Regions:
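Metal-dependent de-N-acetylase/amidase catalytic core
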Residues: 2-23, 99-262
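Active-site rim/loop-helix segments in enzyme catalytic domains that contact anionic ligands
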Residues: 1-112, 244, 256-261
Length: 262
């Protein structure tokens, strides 16, 4: 069954399609898991429908292969419980924020019609991350313009769609979060989704997957846990995920705030 899922994922979206409440976008497979998988799992447990869109296949990665990345991404998708995962197969390292790539992303945005999009950090150690963030924000805006015409896989004209919110998860370079989501109850599941990428992150059983990299050490996984603790502490919880937004957020009343014991 796993082989069938991977083959389906390589050629078409994994899982069922349809409108999503939340679409998480990452330029590389594993970006979403590292940045916002706890929030995805939380939202799904609260009855929301979520999906993942990978922009590239991560083919320039030093460890693993395209095939193993698909297998790992499919496993992580099942752990998170997302309804769909699709890969747009843009060129890792060389994609651009231009009309060609914007139109490709607009087709996906209009296909899934998400209310909320969560995507890469606005700037980061890896230049792909910031470029993907700008590509996503520009494409989300253009997707709402009626005169930007696109067609779906069947050749039918797509309707314009603009997500209500775009949020950016925090990656390697620390950004002070604009808001924080409590992921304490799902933290172990989040780490399980991250560790599904056995060729990318520390795994003593997978020592033959290529040279040691910045993210393949045990220290990197330790830093992921530490980051979640530090962010969670800011709102008085055990673990948190932080996000940045370019649009002001509002709440209906003060009861919506997380209580911090002092």
């Amino acid at each position: 069954m796993a082989d069938t899922l991977v083959k389906n994922f390589q050629n078409s979206p994994l899982g069922a399609g349809g409108k999503l409440d939340l679409l998480a976008i990452g330029v590389h497979p594993d970006d979403v898991e590292l940045g916002c998988s706890g929030t995805i799992i939380n939202e799904i447990k609260n009855g929301k429908k979520a999906g993942v869109l990978d922009l590239t296949q991560g083919e320039l990665g030093s460890r693993g292969s395209v095939e193993t990345r698909y297998e790992e991404a499919a496993k992580a998708a099942m752990i998170m419980g997302v309804s769909v995962r699709e890969n747009l197969k843009m060129r890792d390292g060389f994609f651009q924020n231009d009309e060609e790539h914007q139109r490709k992303l607009i087709v996906a945005i209009r296909k899934y019609q998400p209310e909320v999009v969560i995507t890469n950090a606005l700037s980061d150690r890896h230049p792909d991350h910031g470029r993907a963030a700008k590509l996503t924000t520009d494409s989300c805006f253009l997707s709402g313009l009626r005169k930007v015409e696109t067609k779906d896989e069947k050749g039918d004209q797509q309707e314009p769609w603009r997500p209500k919110y775009i949020f950016h998860y925090i990656q390697d370079r620390y950004h002070e979060p604009d808001f924080i989501i409590d992921i304490s109850d799902v933290f172990e599941q989040r780490m399980e989704a991250i560790k599904a990428y056995t060729t990318q992150f520390y795994n003593p059983e997978n020592e033959d997957d290529g040279p040691q990299t910045y993210i393949s050490t045990s220290a990197f996984l330790d830093s992921i846990v530490a980051r979640a603790r530090v962010i969670g502490k800011k709102i008085g919880v055990q673990y948190g995920e932080g996000f940045n937004t370019e649009k002001s957020l509002g709440i209906k009343n003060l009861d919506s705030l997380v209580t911090i014991e002092t």
